[in-house]
Amino acid sequence: MAAASISAIGCNQTLIGTSFYGGWGSSISGEDYQTMLSKTVAPPQQARVSRKAIRAVPMMKNVNEGKGLFAPLVVVTRNLVGKKRFNQLRGKAIALHSQVITEFCKSIGADAKQRQGLIRLAKKNGERLGFLA
């Protein structure tokens, strides 16, 4: 078994009838790699930034936040017990209040639609008084 080595660099003679002239860095059109890169790669440009202000995503917020008779007490309590524990207590209080409203509606014979209206009214009053601050 004989090993043959072929060198592609400097192959200007037509030994085998090839039209390859140049080194490994040559492209199909005959240009070398550095010349081709300088033609195709443009210098990096700065990204265009819109002059318009980017709008923040609207968040569901209480319009009366920080207002109302009980708002300062609610804010101080939330800061003392922590946000997670405060939301748990608030959820329990809201659930208990909804149960009281439901029992009241049962005792006076109000239907479900009236009960829902009373719960919505309680929520609006809570917002105005600052319980949802």
Swiss-Prot record:
InterPro entries: PGR5
Protein's UniProt keywords contain Membrane: yes
Phenotypic effect of disruption: Normal green leaves under continuous-light conditions. Not able to grow under fluctuating-light conditions. The kea3 pgr5 double mutant combines the phenotypes of the single mutants in non-photochemical quenching (NPQ) induction upon overnight dark adaptation. The double mutant missing DLDG1 and PGR5 (dldg1 pgr5) has a pale-green phenotype similar to the dldlg1 simple mutant in continuous light, and a partial compensation of the growth impairment of pgr5 simple mutant under fluctuating-light conditions; higher NPQ than in pgr5 but lower NPQ than in dldg1.
Feature: transit peptide: 1-60
Post-translational modification remark: Disulfide bonds; Cys-11 and Cys-105 are probably involved in the formation of disulfide bridges with 'Cys-300' and 'Cys-303' of PGRL1A. 'Cys-272' and 'Cys-275' of PGRL1A may also be used to form the disulfide bridges, but in this case the cyclic electron flow is lost.
Membrane topology field: Peripheral membrane protein
Annotated GO CC locations: chloroplast; chloroplast thylakoid; chloroplast thylakoid membrane
Induction of the gene: Up-regulated by drought stress.
GO MF entries: electron transfer activity
Primary localization class, coarse: plastid
GO BP annotations listed: cellular response to light intensity; photoprotection; photosynthetic electron transport in photosystem I; response to high light intensity; response to water deprivation
Assembly information from the UniProt record: Interacts with PGRL1A and PGRL1B.
UniProt cross-references to PANTHER family, sorted A to Z: PROTEIN PROTON GRADIENT REGULATION 5, CHLOROPLASTIC
Reported function: Critical for growth under fluctuating-light conditions. Involved in the regulation of the cyclic electron flow (CEF) around Photosystem I. Essential for the reduction of PGRL1A by ferredoxin and for photoprotection. Contributes to maximize photosynthesis efficiency after a long dark adaptation via the regulation of non-photochemical quenching (NPQ); acts independently from DLDG1. Promotes the induction of steady-state proton motive force (pmf) and energy-dependent quenching (qE).
Name of the featured protein: Protein PROTON GRADIENT REGULATION 5, chloroplastic
Organism expressing this protein natively: Arabidopsis thaliana (Mouse-ear cress)
